Amino acid sequence: MWLLLHVILLTEVKDFALADSSMVAPLCPKGYFPCGNLTKCLPRAFHCDGVDDCGNGADEDNCGDTSGWTTIFGTVHGNVNKVTLTQECFLSQYPQHCYCRENELECVKADLKAVPKVSSNVTLLSLKKNKIHRLPVKVFSRYTELRKIYLQHNCITHISRRAFLGLHNLQILYLSHNCITSLRPGIFKDLHQLAWLILDDNPITRISQKSFMGLNSLFFLSMVGNRLEALPETLCAQMPQLNWVDLANNGIKYITNSTFLTCDSLTVLFLPRNQIGFVPEKTFSSLKNLGELDLSSNMITKLPVHLFSDLHLLQKLNLSSNPLLYVHKNQFGSLKQLQSLDLERIEIPNISTGMFQPMKNLSHIYLKTFRYCSYVPHVRICMPSTDGISSSEDLLANGILRVSVWVIAFITCVGNFLVIAVRSLIKAENTTHAMSIKILCCADCLMGVYLFSVGVFDIKYRGQYQKYALLWMESVPCRLLGFLATLSTEVSVLLLTFLTLEKFLVIVFPFSNLRLGKRQTAVALASIWVVGFLIAAVPFTREDYFGNFYGKNGVCFPLHYDQAEDFGSRGYSLGIFLGVNLLAFLVIVISYVTMFCSIHKTALQTAEVRSHIGKEVAVANRFFFIVFSDAICWIPVFVVKILSLLQVEIPGTITSWIVVFFLPVNSALNPILYTLTTSFFKDKLKQLLHKHRRKPIFKVKKKSLSASIVWTDESSLKLGVLSKIALGDSIMKPVSP
């Protein structure tokens, strides 16, 4: 029966491998896939999205990854063993707490300490979850008709070399979840018909070829969760019919060219979650029938270029979660029948479309980043289907993001243009400060232009983004947008720091001569723009070191929090955000705290303390909102960068929310905080409105200097705070004792 099963499986393998080539499908453009037997083609984004876009449901068929032999094996095995049993018991002798049905006996959780005596015609014996610790000599010798034995969860520590003597008809043996430390040579020598041997979750540290002596018909060997550090020199020497081997979650450190040399029948090989560091080039050369290979979660850093050259029938390959440093361009060139390829958590710096082109039957691929999916336009299902920003359909995958990018861009541009216009029309006493504010608004306007551009390209690629994703991220417009966003961000940060320090000197040291003149201020502002330009332009100077610095995501912003990013890109991004920007943020926070403390101290020293309470509250409120807006903008970025340093996995959606919602906060709020809400602006606006409403009846006469009220634009208290200060009280002298 098991030989028949083996023949069926091999037939299924070859038929399944050729199935796709026999199907006639319409020719579709790159990135599009057929709707079954219809002439209609749809892009990848419309396949397996839960919606019948084809009209015949073909776009929602075969969405699950059923390649490999798990499904085929389960189906065939299920059909062979599907037998309906009656409730009648054919056993005359068995323990009281056991359940009998025909010739099968289940003694689960029966508190047994040894194999019980039962009728010799038993065919299935289940002794799971008992207290059996030893299997002595000939313990099953009376039960020559046994076909299945289940001994899981017993903590068996000792198995006699002759424990299974005489079980010539045994087909399935479960010894998983026990305390077996070794397999003695010849322990299975009488089990010539055994097809399944399951030894999962045992502390077995070593096995040899002689451990499996006699297993001529073994089809399935599972040793998951053991403590193996090495495999026998030739694993299949005593198991010529071995078809499926599962050695997951062990401590295997190496495999050699001879390990699977005699495993001609092997179709499934699982070796995930081990400690394999290198796989020799000829390791799998004899596995001509291999259909599924899993090498995931090992320590493999390098793969020989011809490692898979003999695996012509391989349909499923899993290499995910390995610290691979390089993937050869022709690594998968011979895998013509491959249908599923898993490369999750693997950085491929030399990725190209040619690397995957030979795999014509590939239907499922799993890659590290959504960006990589643009290199496999011929694959129907590519995961991840989004990077949190973009999807296969749209540059901005989230509907909220699509709307918000326009709203925030509009607020940012209109607010800053309004401030520039108003500041140009209204004459202020402090012209240098007004100039600084207008320059700040220019920098913030660039962020609005960046967001508008992202919105425009989102509309341009709507519904077909994946088709153009690679071209877009490598394009000049994308790089220019990234440059523009970085320039805006850095110039804005440096300008805010400059303005903060300028006011810090005015408030904390009111009697010093540390003041910048108009020319000095102009030089400082020009220098800030030059520095910001250089910071944003440096990645263009060495593309071999920085890579495509601005083209790592659809919005072209260089947050770079992924561990596997190019070292140059990631290091430079860290230098910008955790170097320049974090330092600037700390300077701003400390300066405002010091300024508030200085104002508070000065107020307490005046004679009219109560008159200053309301003013202090106003100052405190405005200082709070200035610092709070900076915190909203930068703290999320700092947290993300610090978490990336700690190697914490960060969801891809983070970038989109930071770029659309958090980073533009300062650009959108700066006009409000520094101009539109100030008393200076309000009063000047009222004056302009009055001029348009009525003609002046009389001219205001000049008053004496001591009683005059002077309008000041940020001249004494804070950045963005304007107030009327009587000149006589503006210099707050200490109260004499």
Swiss-Prot record:
<feature type="repeat" description="LRR 6">
    <location>
        <begin position="241"/>
        <end position="262"/>
    </location>
</feature>
<feature type="glycosylation site" description="N-linked (GlcNAc...) asparagine">
    <location>
        <position position="318"/>
    </location>
</feature>
<keyword id="KW-0297">G-protein coupled receptor</keyword>
<feature type="repeat" description="LRR 8">
    <location>
        <begin position="289"/>
        <end position="310"/>
    </location>
</feature>
<feature type="topological domain" description="Cytoplasmic">
    <location>
        <begin position="597"/>
        <end position="622"/>
    </location>
</feature>
<dbReference type="GO" id="GO:0007189">
    <property type="term" value="P:adenylate cyclase-activating G protein-coupled receptor signaling pathway"/>
</dbReference>
<keyword id="KW-0325">Glycoprotein</keyword>
<keyword id="KW-0675">Receptor</keyword>
<dbReference type="InterPro" id="IPR017452">
    <property type="entry name" value="GPCR_Rhodpsn_7TM"/>
</dbReference>
<keyword id="KW-0433">Leucine-rich repeat</keyword>
<feature type="repeat" description="LRR 5">
    <location>
        <begin position="217"/>
        <end position="238"/>
    </location>
</feature>
<dbReference type="InterPro" id="IPR003591">
    <property type="entry name" value="Leu-rich_rpt_typical-subtyp"/>
</dbReference>
<feature type="transmembrane region" description="Helical; Name=1">
    <location>
        <begin position="400"/>
        <end position="420"/>
    </location>
</feature>
<feature type="glycosylation site" description="N-linked (GlcNAc...) asparagine">
    <location>
        <position position="121"/>
    </location>
</feature>
<comment type="similarity">
    <text>Belongs to the G-protein coupled receptor 1 family.</text>
</comment>
<feature type="topological domain" description="Extracellular">
    <location>
        <begin position="460"/>
        <end position="478"/>
    </location>
</feature>
<dbReference type="InterPro" id="IPR032675">
    <property type="entry name" value="LRR_dom_sf"/>
</dbReference>
<feature type="repeat" description="LRR 10">
    <location>
        <begin position="337"/>
        <end position="358"/>
    </location>
</feature>
<keyword id="KW-1015">Disulfide bond</keyword>
<dbReference type="GO" id="GO:0016500">
    <property type="term" value="F:protein-hormone receptor activity"/>
</dbReference>
<feature type="disulfide bond">
    <location>
        <begin position="35"/>
        <end position="54"/>
    </location>
</feature>
<dbReference type="GO" id="GO:0001556">
    <property type="term" value="P:oocyte maturation"/>
</dbReference>
<keyword id="KW-0472">Membrane</keyword>
<feature type="topological domain" description="Extracellular">
    <location>
        <begin position="1"/>
        <end position="399"/>
    </location>
</feature>
<dbReference type="GO" id="GO:0008584">
    <property type="term" value="P:male gonad development"/>
</dbReference>
<feature type="domain" description="LDL-receptor class A">
    <location>
        <begin position="27"/>
        <end position="64"/>
    </location>
</feature>
<dbReference type="InterPro" id="IPR023415">
    <property type="entry name" value="LDLR_class-A_CS"/>
</dbReference>
<feature type="topological domain" description="Cytoplasmic">
    <location>
        <begin position="675"/>
        <end position="737"/>
    </location>
</feature>
<dbReference type="InterPro" id="IPR001611">
    <property type="entry name" value="Leu-rich_rpt"/>
</dbReference>
<keyword id="KW-1133">Transmembrane helix</keyword>
<keyword id="KW-0807">Transducer</keyword>
<feature type="transmembrane region" description="Helical; Name=6">
    <location>
        <begin position="623"/>
        <end position="643"/>
    </location>
</feature>
<feature type="topological domain" description="Cytoplasmic">
    <location>
        <begin position="421"/>
        <end position="438"/>
    </location>
</feature>
<feature type="repeat" description="LRR 9">
    <location>
        <begin position="313"/>
        <end position="334"/>
    </location>
</feature>
<protein>
    <recommendedName>
        <fullName>Relaxin receptor 2</fullName>
    </recommendedName>
</protein>
<dbReference type="InterPro" id="IPR002172">
    <property type="entry name" value="LDrepeatLR_classA_rpt"/>
</dbReference>
<dbReference type="InterPro" id="IPR000276">
    <property type="entry name" value="GPCR_Rhodpsn"/>
</dbReference>
<dbReference type="GO" id="GO:0007193">
    <property type="term" value="P:adenylate cyclase-inhibiting G protein-coupled receptor signaling pathway"/>
</dbReference>
<feature type="repeat" description="LRR 7">
    <location>
        <begin position="265"/>
        <end position="286"/>
    </location>
</feature>
<feature type="transmembrane region" description="Helical; Name=7">
    <location>
        <begin position="654"/>
        <end position="674"/>
    </location>
</feature>
<keyword id="KW-1003">Cell membrane</keyword>
<feature type="glycosylation site" description="N-linked (GlcNAc...) asparagine">
    <location>
        <position position="361"/>
    </location>
</feature>
